Amino acid sequence: MNDFWKSYDITHAELGPNFRCYPLYGKIHLIELALSLVFIVGIALWYRRSSASARRRILVGVTIALLADEAALLLGMALTGQWNWSYLPLHLCSINVFVCLYNTLTDQNWCKEELYALCIPGAALALLCPSWLDVPSWWTLINLHSISIHALLVLYPVLLVVRGYRPSARRAPQVLAFLFGSALPIYFLNKPLNTNFYFLNNPYGNVITSAFTRLLGEKYYILGFLPAIAVALCLMYLPWVVADARHKKRK
C-alpha cells in the first residue's frame, strides 16, 4: 500500500507506536500553520468585502468543503480496508462539522455560540498541538485531511463573527450544556467500541492530555479538561465583556 493511504494502525505496526512524521513546530509544522493562517485570514477578508448574496455562497461553500473533507477520510479508509470504529465522526471537531451544516441550513444562534466558543479554540489547539502525527509522512490522507478540516473549522465561525454575530458570555451555559451533554454518551460509547472520542478513554497520543496525565496521573487526567475549558471560555469571551463594559461606560 502506498504510504499516502496508510492509517495509524498500519503505521504503528510498521514504524512503531512512537513514530512521528514531523516534530512539533518544526519546519513542516510551521509551514502548515502559516498556510492555514493565510487561508483563514484571506477568506475572512474576502467574505468581509463581499455582498450579502456572495457571503451566503461563501458560507455554503465552506460548509460543503467541510462535509467533503470529512467524507474523503471516511471513504479513503473504507476503500483501502482500514476503516474501524475510531473513524466515526464523533470527535468534537467532527461533530462540529455537522453543527456547521445545521447552522448553514437553519441559522441558529446556539450553533453560532457553540462554534465560536468551542470550535475556534478546539480546532486552533488541534492545529497547534496535532495528535495525528503517527502516520508515515506529512503527505498522507490523514495529515492533509486533519490540517485542512481544522483550518476550515476555525474559518467557519470566524466568518459568522465577521458577518456581525456577537457572542455573549450569557450563552456560556448553553455551550457547556452542549459540550457535557455530548461528552457523556460518548464517554460510555468509547468503552465497548475501544475508541477514544473526545480523548476520554485514554490520554495517549495527544500533547494536551499527556500534559494532564503528568500533572494529575492517568486515573484523573480527565479532570484537566475542566480548568482548560474554563480558560478557553474566558479567553473567548473576555474581549466581548471588555467591549460591552467600555460601551456602557461611554453611555
Residue spans of the language-model regions?
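Membrane-interface transmembrane-helix boundary segments in multi-pass integral membrane proteins
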Residues: 17-35, 193-233
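Hydrophobic core of alpha-helical transmembrane segments in multi-pass integral membrane proteins
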Residues: 30-48, 66-71, 183, 226-239
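Alpha-helical transmembrane segments in multipass membrane proteins, preferentially the mid-helix core
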Residues: 41-45, 100, 152-171
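N-terminal topogenic module of multi-pass integral membrane proteins
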Residues: 1-56
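Membrane-proximal helix-loop-helix units in multi-pass membrane proteins
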Residues: 105-156
